[in-house]
C-alpha cells in the first residue's frame, strides 16, 4: 500500500497534545498560500491548517467594495467566520493550529477611527491573547515578484504594501511576533517561515518518526 503524506510525515507521538494557535499573516501577495501548502505537506498530522476566512466570505459572494458602508460589515463577517474556524481547530488532537490570518488582521482593513473590536464585543488585548505566536510574511514590492494572479486579489503592489504596513502595526503589541522579510528568492523566505512554524511545535512533533 502506498504511503500517504500523513504516513510519511508521522511524528510517532503517543500522547495527546495541548493545542496552541499560530497566525501566519502578511499583506496581499506575501506568499501565505504557498507557505501554508508546504506546511500541510511537510509537517506531521498534529499540525492543522485553517483556511482563510476572508476567502470564504468573499469567495462565497459577500458584497465587497471600497466604501465604509461595505467594508465594516465585511470585516465583521470575516471576524466571526475566523472565530468559528478557530473553534473547529479544537476538534482532534492538534498540537498546532495554523491560522491563515487572525482576527487582529481586520484592523488593517477597517475604515475610520472607531473601534472595530468594540463593534464585535471584544478588545485588541483579548484578540492578541488568543494566539501563541504571529509570523508575518512581508509583502514584496513590485520588482520583487508581487503576484497579481489571485482572482480575489484586487490590490496594486503599492496598495498591498500599505496594507502590509497596517498589518504590522495591528500586531505590533504581540509578544511573540516574528517577521519574514520579502526577498526575490521565495524559497529562502518559505524556508525561514517553515522554521519559525516548526519552532512553535512541541519537540515530539518537530521531525518525522524514524522508519526502518
Which residue ranges define each predicted feature?
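Extreme N-terminal, non-catalytic leader segments
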Residues: 1-21
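Hydrophobic anchor at the beta1->P-loop junction of P-loop NTPases
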Residues: 24
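P-loop (Walker A) phosphate-binding loop of NTP-binding proteins
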Residues: 27
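Conserved lysine of the Walker
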Residues: 32
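Short amphipathic alpha-helices and their capping/turn segments at secondary-structure boundaries
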Residues: 36-43, 75-94, 116-131
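Conserved substrate/cofactor phosphate-moiety recognition/catalytic segment
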Residues: 37-81
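Conserved nucleotide-sensing/catalytic segment adjacent to the nucleotide-binding pocket
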Residues: 63-113
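A glycine- and Lys/Arg-enriched "phosphate-lid" helix/loop adjacent to the NTP-binding pocket
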Residues: 109, 114-172, 181-193, 201, ...
Amino acid at each position: 500500500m502506498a504511503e500517504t503524506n500523513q504516513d510519511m510525515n508521522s511524528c510517532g507521538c503517543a500522547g495527546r497534545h495541548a493545542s496552541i494557535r499560530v497566525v501566519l499573516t502578511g499583506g496581499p501577495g506575501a506568499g501565505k498560500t504557498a507557505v501554508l501548502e508546504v506546511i500541510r505537506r511537510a509537517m506531521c498530522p498534529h499540525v492543522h491548517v485553517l483556511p482563510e476566512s476572508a476567502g470564504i466570505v468573499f469567495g462565497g459572494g459577500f458584497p465587497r467594495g471600497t466604501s465604509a458602508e461595505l467594508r465594516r460589515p465585511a470585516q465583521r463577517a470575516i471576524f466571526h467566520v475566523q472565530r468559528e474556524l478557530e473553534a473547529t481547530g479544537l476538534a482532534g488532537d492538534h498540537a498546532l493550529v495554523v491560522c491563515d490570518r487572525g482576527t487582529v488582521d481586520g484592523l488593517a482593513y477597517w475604515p475610520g477611527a472607531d473601534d472595530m473590536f468594540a463593534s464585535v464585543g471584544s478588545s485588541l488585548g483579548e484578540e492578541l491573547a488568543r494566539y501563541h505566536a504571529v509570523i508575518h510574511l512581508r509583502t514584496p514590492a513590485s520588482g520583487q515578484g508581487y503576484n497579481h494572479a489571485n482572482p480575489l486579489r484586487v490590490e496594486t503592489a503599492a496598495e498591498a504594501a500599505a496594507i502590509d504596513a497596517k498589518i504590522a502595526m495591528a500586531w505590533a503589541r504581540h509578544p511573540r511576533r516574528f517577521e519574514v522579510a520579502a526577498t526575490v528568492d521565495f524559497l529562502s523566505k518559505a524556508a525561514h517561515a517553515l522554521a519559525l512554524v516548526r519552532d512553535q511545535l512541541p519537540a515530539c512533533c518537530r521531525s518525522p518518526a524514524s522508519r526502518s
